[in-house]
Curated annotation (Swiss-Prot):
Family as reported in the entry's similarity comment: Belongs to the universal ribosomal protein uS2 family.
Provenance organism: Uncinocarpus reesii (strain UAMH 1704)
GO BP terms, alphabetized: ribosomal small subunit assembly; translation
SUPFAM superfamilies xref list: Ribosomal protein S2
Taxonomic lineage: Eukaryota, Fungi, Dikarya, Ascomycota, Pezizomycotina
Keywords: Cytoplasm, Ribonucleoprotein, Ribosomal protein
Gene: RPS0
Location of region: Disordered: 276-297
Keyword Ribonucleoprotein included in the entry's annotation: yes
Keyword Transmembrane helix: no
UniProt GO molecular function: structural constituent of ribosome
Function, in words: Required for the assembly and/or stability of the 40S ribosomal subunit. Required for the processing of the 20S rRNA-precursor to mature 18S rRNA in a late step of the maturation of 40S ribosomal subunits.
Description of how the protein assembles with itself and partners: Component of the small ribosomal subunit. Mature ribosomes consist of a small (40S) and a large (60S) subunit. The 40S subunit contains about 33 different proteins and 1 molecule of RNA (18S). The 60S subunit contains about 49 different proteins and 3 molecules of RNA (25S, 5.8S and 5S). Interacts with RPS21.
Protein name: Small ribosomal subunit protein uS2
Length: 297
């Protein structure tokens, strides 16, 4: 790591550097844009370009100082069309007061005042210049400064401040947004001193797969159900005596109801039907033919 050009108060701690390395913020892609060459440390034998995380930290501090210089936090727009960065921008907006656009960027949001999503921010921050190209293009039309998380292969056209980092890994994206939010709060004075620990853990900025979370909740619910039943219930037969008693009572009540109600209902019904058949003309004809049939048999 090259020596830092920042004042001592802005220098990164060893813990910050360890977090950047653990999140693989230093691992770029195999391609290299010419404008990202100053941020390159070396190229590994397998072709992966390694980013100088000292430069990454310097750009995080520079971006935080730009953000803190804007009086109204609502004039800052944070954008991420990449799924891995959507949770991070929403959390960043919640903690700093910025406006978040997570998901698809509606074309014309910065240039077409007729649209409902029209905005006039003083600064935009994007997760990936390639996936958020529409937002950067419109910002260039209306002279909005752009801060972007740039990988080694990211286009830097119309990007004013490039933060060199891995912008494809969910941990790298979440960590950079978390560090940026923390530095902004420190510069605003929300965190009393630089030694004060931020009580928001970095895990909140990481992307979470909805399907994986759902499956995890189902497994936890199943495990909780097994624990509630327990081995004691299995050995005792799940309260078989109670089931027999309740079943016997239920069937006994049903039988009693049938015995008391059915005969009366049946008698009344058959009497009415018998009277109808007796009074009808065809019934007499059948009664006359019956003895002849008995004689034949």
């Amino acid at each position: 790591m090259a020596p830092s050009n920042l004042p001592p108060v802005f220098n990164a701690t060893s813990q910050d550097m360890e977090m950047l390395l653990a999140a693989q913020c230093h691992l770029g892609s195999k391609n290299l844009q010419v404008h990202m060459d100053p941020y390159l440390w070396k190229t590994r034998p397998d072709g992966i370009n390694v980013i100088n995380i000292g430069k990454t930290w310097e750009k995080i501090v520079l971006a935080a100082r730009i953000i803190a210089a804007i009086d109204n936090p609502a004039d800052i727009c944070v954008i991420s069309a990449r799924p891995y960065g959507q949770r991070a921008v929403l959390k960043f907006a919640a903690h700093t007061g910025a406006v978040a656009i997570a998901g698809r960027f509606t074309p014309g949001s910065f240039t077409n005042y007729i649209t409902r999503s029209f905005k006039e921010p003083r600064l935009i921050i994007v997760t990936d210049p390639r996936t958020d190209a529409q937002a950067i293009k419109e910002a260039s039309y209306v002279n909005i400064p752009v801060i972007a998380l740039c990988d080694t292969d990211s286009p830097t056209e119309y990007v004013d401040v490039a933060i060199p980092t891995n912008n494809k890994g969910r941990h790298a994206i979440g960590l950079v947004w978390w560090l940026l939010a923390r530095e902004v709060l420190r510069l605003r004075g929300t965190l009393a001193t630089r030694e004060t620990e931020w009580d928001v853990v970095v895990d909140l900025y990481f992307y979470r797969d909805p399907e994986a979370e759902e499956a995890k909740e189902l497994e936890e619910a199943k495990a909780a159900g097994v624990d509630e039943i327990g081995p004691g219930a299995v050995e005792s037969g799940f309260g078989a005596e109670g089931w027999e008693a309740s079943a016997g009572t239920a069937f006994g009540a049903a039988a009693a109801t049938t015995t008391t109600t059915n005969p009366a209902t049946a008698t009344a019904t058959w009497e009415a039907t018998g009277g109808d058949w007796a009074s009808s003309a065809p019934a007499e004809g059948w009664a006359g033919e019956a003895p002849a049939t008995e004689a034949k048999w």
